[in-house]
A protein has these predicted regions:
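Alpha-helix boundary/capping detector
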Residues: 38-49, 66-73, 96-97, 105
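Basic/aromatic recognition patch in beta-strand/loop cores that engages polyanionic ligands
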Residues: 50, 54-85
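Basic side chains
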Residues: 7, 39, 53, 68, ...
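Enriched for short, Lys/Arg-rich terminal
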Residues: 27, 72-76, 80-106
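Basic, Lys/Arg-enriched alpha-helical interface segments
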Residues: 1-63
Length: 106
């Protein structure tokens, strides 16, 4: 079975740090924050095998560009699949206006 390199953008890393900080500092739940961070990180690393298992996003032009969405608890991991690598673009809270936030990242 083919294995892909998983590359995480600076924006996605920043998203994960902000998720951790919000839960740990605003909600005062550092253990929960670490658990959430670890679940997201593990899910991202799992994209090294069968990254096509997650659906393409429904909005255009993101769908045509091959952007996929993986749900992890209340968060969405957005990524593309290349020939040998998976590129994680963003990790966003799923209840937010995802299309608007994705388009701002360009």
């Amino acid at each position: 079975m083919k294995q892909y390199d998983v590359k995480i953008s600076h924006a996605a890393l920043s998203d994960m740090e902000q998720i951790y900080s919000y839960i740990a500092d605003r909600l005062l739940e550092p253990d929960t924050a670490m658990g959430q961070y670890n679940r997201i990180a593990e899910a991202i690393q799992s994209l090294n095998i069968l990254p096509e298992r997650c659906a393409l996003v429904e909005s255009e032009p993101e769908r045509t560009q091959g952007l996929r969405q993986m749900l992890v608890d209340n968060y969405s991991v957005f990524y593309t699949v290349g020939e040998d690598a998976v590129s994680v673009a963003r990790v966003l809270y799923s209840a937010s206006d995802l299309v608007r936030r994705l388009r701002r990242m360009k």
